[in-house]
Amino acid sequence: MIRIGPSGSTTQAKSTLEAVDIVADMGLTALEVNYVRGARASEETTRKVGAKAEQRGVTLSAHAPYYVSLNSPRDEVRDSSVTHIVETARRCQWLGAPFFAVHGGTYGGKESPEATDGVVERILTVQTRLEEEGIVGVKVGLETTGRPSAWGTPEEIGSVAEQTDIVIPVVDFSHVHARSGGGLKTTEDFQALVDWALEVSDCQLYCHFQSIEYGEKGERRHLPVDRWDPDFRLLAPVLRQIPCDVHLIC
């Protein structure tokens, strides 16, 4: 099944609880709860959102804080980044959300292999903390990034997934398109990326799609889907043929 919905509360909603109703009333079936400025929502409120979503047939995911930086040269930033991920996972468990998206941050002045090793180390710490704190059934979705300065190519994310038990990729098609200088030009380009993600994630696809403005340094800003860059009409037939669940955030 393909489930489609927005990230964050709509402009009409005063709360995430209201956003669930608005999304469902629009005929959409997915919502990404934004914790981009901190995962601080109370357990009571979060469980109410999860119950409302289940009642209305909306599948939830979440987005971790933007200030996660797993390769920061500062110990306290790396440690707080781990905590941000753990706290997002905790709220996903309360929500009944099976996964959430997180950006890994920059390379921290390191080459790709060393930076990837650093991400593995931090994710293994997250994995241990989740086990110790009884947070189960939630996957950490490492999101593909839109700038060469940001850690998060498909190859890097795949390497972390291979070395940990809790990681799946979050394929942001616009980010991949921008980082590659407009590389998603054909249905075959999208198919190859989707095939990779399904293999790494054991046949589940959590993805983002928007159009995007980009330049030599990658992404500049997100744009409405109907700017057709990348072209959703090339991706649609690929999504229709996927034999497992798709969680598409637009």
Give the label of every model feature segment.
Residues 7-11, 34-38, 65-69, 105-107, ...:
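Active-site beta-loop-alpha junctions enriched in small/polar residues
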